[in-house]
């Protein structure tokens, strides 16, 4: 469980009045804001904070789970030839819609550079 705290007393005076999210399961603390030394979103072992006293801060929402290094997948069910023909003859494909960064977009509304990029990233020889 994650607990929000404001440090009220500490051996390190830079920690006083700083706000943290404590994850007791992992014995980690995430800095929300501090005067100096620690930067926002920095994660440290709770033991690095030393001897502290704090007051709990109610959290109105559950902390967002952050997945670093994740990937985004856009699925476009098309043949390469269809997109290449749409580049050459856009009038034949006025309703051709693809997914780009999670959004639906008309292929013909993309710049030529963006169209080439979509074709290059959508079709690969192997994984």
UniProtKB/Swiss-Prot annotation:
Question: Which PROSITE patterns does the record cross-reference, listed alphabetically?
Answer: GLY_RADICAL_1, GLY_RADICAL_2
Asked if Transport is a keyword of the record, the answer is no
Q: Give the protein's function.
A: Acts as a radical domain for damaged PFL and possibly other radical proteins.
Record's Pfam families? Gly_radical
Q: Which residue ranges does the record assign to the Glycine radical domain?
A: 5-127
| Protein keywords | Organic radical
What is the official name of this protein in its record? Answer: Autonomous glycyl radical cofactor
One cellular component term from this protein's GO annotations in UniProt: cytosol
Glycine radical occurs at 102
The protein's organism comes out as Pectobacterium carotovorum subsp. carotovorum (strain PC1)
Quote the InterPro entries the UniProt record gives: Auton_GlycylRad_Cofactor, Form_AcTrfase_GR_CS, Gly_radical, Glycyl_radical_cofactor_GrcA
Which lineage do the record's taxonomy fields give for this organism?
Answer: Bacteria, Pseudomonadati, Pseudomonadota, Gammaproteobacteria, Enterobacterales
Gene Ontology terms, MF aspect: formate C-acetyltransferase activity
The keyword Lipid metabolism belongs to this UniProt entry's keyword annotation: no
């Amino acid at each position: 469980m994650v607990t929000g705290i404001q440090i009220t007393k500490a051996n390190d005076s830079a920690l006083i009045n700083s706000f943290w999210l404590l994850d007791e399961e992992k014995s980690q603390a995430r800095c929300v804001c501090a005067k100096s030394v620690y930067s926002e979103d920095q994660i440290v072992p709770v033991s690095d904070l030393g001897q502290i006293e704090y007051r709990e801060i109610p959290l109105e929402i559950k902390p967002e789970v952050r997945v670093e290094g994740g990937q985004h997948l856009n699925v476009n069910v098309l043949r390469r030839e269809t997109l290449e023909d749409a580049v050459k003859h856009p009038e034949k494909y006025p309703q051709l819609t693809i997914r780009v960064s999670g959004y639906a977009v008309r292929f013909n509304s993309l710049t030529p550079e963006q169209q080439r990029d979509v074709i290059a990233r959508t079709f690969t020889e192997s994984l």
